[in-house]
Amino acid sequence: MAATCQVTGAVPGFGHNISHSHRRTKRRFDPNVQKKTYYVPSLRRNVKLTLSAKGIKVIDARGIESVVKDILARGVKI
């Protein structure tokens, strides 16, 4: 899925638009997903990740090495 965070696993949510007359139409709530490139010294290369805003904060807090290690342990190809 394109709108999925590789760190947090955030995926789109679904709900309704509700008009003034309370008619409901289906809609999708997408996470704030960005493509971001990081240099990973242990791999000696750049890694391009699809991240939500929260995922970027997780990398800032824990470090890219720790996060990439967890992603690879889950078997996700990066």
From Swiss-Prot:
Keywords (alphabetical) are: Ribonucleoprotein, Ribosomal protein
Is Ribonucleoprotein among the key words of this record? yes
Q: Which GO terms describe its molecular function?
A: structural constituent of ribosome
Look up the domain of life of the source: Bacteria
GO CC annotation? ribonucleoprotein complex; ribosome
Entries under InterPro entries matching the protein: Ribosomal_bL28, Ribosomal_bL28/bL31-like_sf, Ribosomal_bL28_bact-type, Ribosomal_bL28_sf
Which BP terms in the Gene Ontology apply to this protein? Answer: translation
Q: What family does the Swiss-Prot or TrEMBL record give for this protein?
A: Belongs to the bacterial ribosomal protein bL28 family.
Q: What is this protein called?
A: Large ribosomal subunit protein bL28
Organism the protein comes from? Clavibacter michiganensis subsp. michiganensis (strain NCPPB 382)
What gene name is given for the protein in this entry?
A: rpmB
